[in-house]
Amino acid sequence: MARVKRGNIARKRRNKILNLAKGFRGGNKNLFRTANQRVMKALCNAYRDRRRRKRDFRRLWIARINASARINGTNYSKLINGLKTSEIIINRKMLAQLALNDPQSFEKIVSAVSK
């Protein structure tokens, strides 16, 4: 059986982790053990927060729609119910964009729904 020396493979593996740890503070970017722990934690956080981002943006859109709807004399739940009953198909992201960037169009939608 031939002798296997893992020098190149081990260095590659460590450098891969240390490259992922660039930008971390202190020994977390230089020392392999701590860098490995920090990278694993960072990847866990990234996985979790990719799912959380969807929730956070939906909450932001709803808050923006509600604020603009209240300015126009209704509230969020009545506006969404009116959109459903009048069969206007527009999602919350588009509604929030309209409320923020084009208040006149948003006002027309609210008036069309509240009739």
Swiss-Prot record:
GO MF, any single term: rRNA binding
Recorded hits in Pfam families, A to Z, give: Ribosomal_L20 (PF00453)
Q: Write out the GO cellular component annotations.
A: ribonucleoprotein complex; ribosome
Q: Where are the transmembrane segments?
A: none
Instruction: Extract one GO BP annotation from the record.
Output: translation
Keywords of this entry: Ribonucleoprotein, Ribosomal protein, RNA-binding, rRNA-binding
Q: What InterPro entries does UniProt report for this protein, alphabetically?
A: Ribosomal_bL20, RIBOSOMAL_L20_CS, Ribosomal_protein_bL20_C
Q: What does this protein do?
A: Binds directly to 23S ribosomal RNA and is necessary for the in vitro assembly process of the 50S ribosomal subunit. It is not involved in the protein synthesizing functions of that subunit.
Q: Which NCBIfam families match?
A: rplT_bact
Q: Which PANTHER family would you find in this protein's record?
A: 39S RIBOSOMAL PROTEIN L20 (PTHR10986)
Similarity annotation: Belongs to the bacterial ribosomal protein bL20 family.
State the name under which the record lists this protein.
Large ribosomal subunit protein bL20
Q: What is the lineage of its organism?
A: Bacteria, Bacillati, Cyanobacteriota, Cyanophyceae, Synechococcales
This protein's gene is called: rplT
